[in-house]
Amino acid sequence: MFPEYRDLISRLKNENPRFMSLFDKHNKLDHEIARKEGSDGRGYNAEVVRMKKQKLQLKDEMLKILQQESVKEV
């Protein structure tokens, strides 16, 4: 996720509690979605769709923080 921000992500995970919280929630959702869907995708349902939307919102919030912080570094 966001390879262009790899170094910044590492720094923010240590320095920015909000970013770390979003990052952890995103990863937990990712694992939960994979578990619910199963390797064959048969677990795909309305709950998984809701979780994927939530995961996307978290990703958008993280991207905003990354973009704001990257401007500060310039």
Curated annotation (Swiss-Prot):
InterPro entries reported for this sequence: DUF465, DUF465_sf
Alphabetical list of Gene3D superfamilies matching this protein: 6.10.280.50
Protein name per UniProt: Uncharacterized protein YdcH
Organism whose genome encodes this protein: Escherichia coli (strain K12)
Gene: ydcH
